[in-house]
């Protein structure tokens, strides 16, 4: 789930927001705007403090709704994991931006797929094929090899928004549920904290080239968030590890 907080919407706008309304949240700057969230309203709260109104929307990303559906299907002997995964996604009309497995497991006795679609896919992709299963709040789904990231050629430098580092390395687990990343890895590594001016292109498992006075190289986003407000700067914070 994602939480969107907006201040001082008009009374008419507040009254018109309903559960199940579609939500598309764009962010960026003049001439460079992109989407960071697509979903629907599943929770809504308006609160008044003096003359200010705060509206808090709980938004279910569109991919989560589809992946929450139930499946009950049995696949024949010697079925391949890749074929099963593609078929499961096709049943519900899910488009996958990338689908590559570390190990394409074969099931000599066939395989029963029963339960929540996301749970079934996680069992196959992560537990059995030792791969990554990534869903993004924009609705994109990626299935990648364990060591692969999603490389769209993003480079961050001080000239295009990279902010000075204020923290040293901190110990965090590589495997994280934040931002809907699930990996087949079970290990801890040092991650590097960095931030930049809000950048809609930064997302879980994105490969980023960093060029700065104290850090140079290619890194993968382990987790992160976009945040800001009327009294603070709009920033994207990231936990990175070398790629």
What are these regions (language model features)?
Residues 35-40, 56, 72, 218-220, ...:
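Well-ordered beta-strand positions in beta-sheet-rich domains
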Residues 1-14, 18, 147-148, 154-243:
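An acidic/polar, Gly/Ser/Thr-rich interaction patch typically located in mid-to-C-terminal regions
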Residues 52-63, 95-172:
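Short beta-strand-centered interaction patches in the first periplasmic/extracellular domains
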Residues 69-78, 107-111:
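Second-shell loop/turn segments in exported
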Residues 81-97:
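Glycine-rich, acidic and aromatic/proline-enriched surface loops and short helix-turn segments
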Residues 9, 52-68, 233-243:
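Short solvent-exposed strand/turn elements
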Residues 1-58, 230:
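Assembly/oligomerization scaffold segments
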